[in-house]
């Protein structure tokens, strides 16, 4: 926020948001360079002098002033960079500038709506990935039906630009953005639409994520309700871009939602026990009542995507399943509801009754098979789960090799400490431990048995099986009530802002 302060002050002094002139300012591309994940596009003589080249930006801005420079044909894209400019390189730099410029008015609105960082302090716990699981444990154990929905994509480019135009009034900027997006699409015309989205997301992840957030924000502004109240939905607060997880509470009133492109009114029936959760590109809808209302919501989603966003979605792609019979994958876990039945004897005077009770518990399981596939993809084992050596790391020191394996193992243990069955992680720890031993043996050109005979090696590798409870015993005494409670229950951490690369949803 601090590095944008100068440009926010300039924007506040203006009556309207004029973003177009900012694309011709050198400091915008300097900010883009400082945030860019692929900084090589701003470098001159890549691999020799890794310094930000202001000359490249100046030449680009000069060419941008020329008429029809941004209209680039397919033949221009193959031009030799040594004999002239490279249009592909120019497009990547311009897209980085777009990503910085388009965020400025929203940062301005965010800084004015939030009292600097005071309100953001209350959202810190919600930013943790694990904050969603206590919510699921508290709510989903009382629900009966669930619908696991993947938000469809890609969205049409013109609709994407129109969504942005609703928030920012700057016609020249959006004409240029539309021209840039369509030209990029034409360069890759031999790709299908999904492949184009994949290519664009890799070439400029910052701009892609920003546009994708706007798409999700627009669709959720119609169907997703704020936690405290329901209203004619149009999101005003942009704290949505700071929270990684969005979950919303129960609905209390009848709500009518008006969509600008619909010729009819969407009316939502009151259901006090329906919940909506979204993370990344997946949303989960759960309800306690019969699946009638769930089918209503299902058709609302389908009609919205088809009529408002021009995205074809078939009804059979959204399934409504009993929560007790269906497990769904979320954030690297398998979740389902386990029914625990018990019989209670009740006696009243001389009569005795047997009462059967059913208690629902949310069962959160570590997905061992997907984890083994991830380990096999990372070359720690084969597809059958048999550990193999990691020759790429053999050039490092013994301490660095062991530290790398331990860091991966501890991160996985830290992430999956909320699982119902933690013993299933022993197989993952075994694979990493034996892979570490084989890597060290490969480095020293010896067998695994000969390496294990070395003094201290086996004791050092025992850290792979260090239990979380043993770590907690250093913080709390073993005879304390706090340690006993933590020893029995699962532990969710509110400091996990991103998942390990080995943890992913397929």
UniProtKB/Swiss-Prot annotation:
Xref: HAMAP family: MatK
Location, primary (coarse class): plastid
Disulphide-bonded residues: none
Family: Belongs to the intron maturase 2 family. MatK subfamily.
UniProt xrefs under InterPro entries: Domain_X, Maturase_MatK, Maturase_MatK_N
Places the protein is found: Plastid, Chloroplast
Functional summary from the UniProt entry: Usually encoded in the trnK tRNA gene intron. Probably assists in splicing its own and other chloroplast group II introns.
Keywords associated with the record: Chloroplast, mRNA processing, Plastid, RNA-binding, tRNA processing
Protein name per Swiss-Prot or TrEMBL: Maturase K
